[in-house]
Amino acid sequence: MKTGRVLKISGPLVVAEGMEEANIYDVVKVGEKRLIGEIIEMREDRASIQVYEETAGLAPGDPVITTGEPLSVELGPGLIEAMFDGIQRPLNAIKAKAGDFITRGVEVHSLDRDRKWHFTPVKKVGDTVEAGDVIGIVQETSIVEHKIMVPYGIKGTIETIEEGDFTVVDTVAKVKDKDKVSDLIMMQKWPVRRGRPYGRKLNPVEPMITGQRVIDTFFPVTKGGTACVPGPFGSGKTVVQHQLAKWADAQIVVYIGCGERGNEMTDVLNEFPELKDPKTGEPLMKRTVLIANTSNMPVAAREASIYTGITIGEYFRDMGYSVALMADSTSRWAEALREMSGRLEEMPGDEGYPAYLGSRAADFYERAGKVLSLGSEGREGALTVIGAVSPPGGDLSEPVTQATLRIVKVFWGLDSQLAYRRHFPAINWLNSYSLYLEKISPWMDENVASDWTALRTRAMSLLQEEANLEEIVRLVGIDALSEKDRLKLEVAKSLREDYLQQNAFHEVDTYASLEKQYKMLKLVLFFYDETQRALNAGIYLKELLDLEVRDKIARAKYISEESIENIDAIFNELSEVIDELISKGGIMNA
């Protein structure tokens, strides 16, 4: 191909001339060091190139060579447990080749070309296959079975297929369609800006269980849903994302650290190999793909990292897996868009962000969903996307948050006031919402308990009433309230402190199964019902609040999953204590 020349350099933006043979979104190599870039605008023979590496040292006149291919990712065995940068370069391989610091222009394959994987066919010679059909499996980790699929655009009859140890570029099967024979390897390439095709979208009705009480009970997200976690600095966005990556009942987790601090990725690398998946008992790292594009890496690569991550997520979704993708933080991605837009001298929108911010965000989030994959087998897969948003100063009216809220169905609004009061997760139950509640409620009532939805509604109305009563208390004092209203305040406080608060760093409290959540919630509301019964029988509120059983209700969150029946004993004890109190007419142990 014809070589272009650098005309102008403006930070991560390079303008080259003599590029009439190139296409928009082609990957190019810039300068003598062959820096990786992507064409984002074409005007006659001039190409505006977004360079994914530091451009210091480039000069006008340097060569620009187009590869003729769009920015693509390699999909195949070797993705799980790997850590990539924003353009899918494996960081471990770069370290082995160039040292601790990523040198510019370093070229390494995304997937290891030397490592051999044991391929077990599930189809035989003579079988007819089409795009999306599984022809064999590779046991990638102890918990992930990597399904080798027929690439998009290929169909026909299998001519040869064999079991054995192969690298990702070795031919494992041959498919013949009329006179054309296609060699199938274990690796596929896919352009990151194009969503992977599927049969059809399905209605998401099954919740993604996260083990976080405030999320699962009040603001659930479905498998195949979209959610956002906006919040000011220090409100716990990253810890929420880490908790979801650790405990969500997805089979594959893709974690994108997009423009956040490097220490946060270090935490993931330190914790995930040690933490055990509650379902399989294996380390969490054995189902995780990490994309580290930290704040000290080039800004332009942040835009690519989001697309790289979601393409990998779609690939595992096509295998029929439930995938959870965490993007922390989409605000940094939007800032990268803003910087490139400014360099291109485009007309700015709100706060300098480009006018197309909303459509780019929609392109990303709309790639989530529950789908019926391509192929004759009809596998169901789901890709759930959860994006953190970091609005400056916690201002939720800023453009990135507003663009995100127009697209996603679940809003977990983090509140700095709750965080300052050490209430974590600091999800504000009055501001947050989930539009999946109606879809999920029948599943919860069927699979957890028939009165789940009713309990949730009661608890939510109590918290809402507490907010209204607190306004009265601020104006005229708590003594102006009736005993019934004061009881409501106490029960709402119990809901907040004993149920909604959850310690991410406590070995038991970090995760609560749906059964435990149901019993804990029912216990708090049972306390409300029993104390109301006692109040109606003439017992003083102070006596009810001084009961020792209240401490046991507060400590129920620390009961392990194996000893969950101990919560049932608290129900019986509470009922007995109230009965005794009523029969004596109050004042126990007098």
UniProtKB/Swiss-Prot annotation:
Question: Matching Pfam families, A to Z?
Answer: ATP-synt_ab, ATP-synt_ab_N, ATP-synt_ab_Xtn, ATP-synt_VA_C
Question: Where ATP is bound, by residue?
Answer: 231-238
Q: Might you give the EC number(s) for this enzyme?
A: 7.1.2.2
Q: Which GO terms describe its cellular component?
A: proton-transporting ATP synthase complex
SUPFAM superfamilies referenced in this protein's UniProt entry, alphabetically: C-terminal domain of alpha and beta subunits of F1 ATP synthase (SSF47917), N-terminal domain of alpha and beta subunits of F1 ATP synthase (SSF50615), P-loop containing nucleoside triphosphate hydrolases (SSF52540)
Q: Which GO terms describe its biological process?
A: proton motive force-driven plasma membrane ATP synthesis
The reactions it catalyses are: ATP + H2O + 4 H(+)(in) = ADP + phosphate + 5 H(+)(out)
Q: Which UniProt keywords apply?
A: ATP synthesis, ATP-binding, Hydrogen ion transport, Ion transport, Nucleotide-binding, Translocase, Transport
Identify the InterPro entries for this entry.
ATP-synt_VA_C (IPR055190), ATP-synth_a_Xtn (IPR031686), ATP_synth_asu-like_sf (IPR023366), ATPase_a/bsu_AS (IPR020003), ATPase_F1/V1/A1_a/bsu_N (IPR004100), ATPase_F1/V1/A1_a/bsu_N_sf (IPR036121), ATPase_F1/V1/A1_a/bsu_nucl-bd (IPR000194), ATPase_F1/V1_b/a_C (IPR024034)
The text of the family note is: Belongs to the ATPase alpha/beta chains family.
Entry-linked PANTHER family: H(+)-TRANSPORTING TWO-SECTOR ATPASE, V-TYPE PROTON ATPASE CATALYTIC SUBUNIT A
Reported function: Produces ATP from ADP in the presence of a proton gradient across the membrane. The V-type alpha chain is a catalytic subunit.
Which NCBIfam families does this chain map to?
PRK04192.1
Q: What is this protein called?
A: V-type ATP synthase alpha chain
Which species is this UniProt entry from?
Answer: Clostridium botulinum (strain Langeland / NCTC 10281 / Type F)
Q: What gene, per UniProt, encodes this protein?
A: atpA
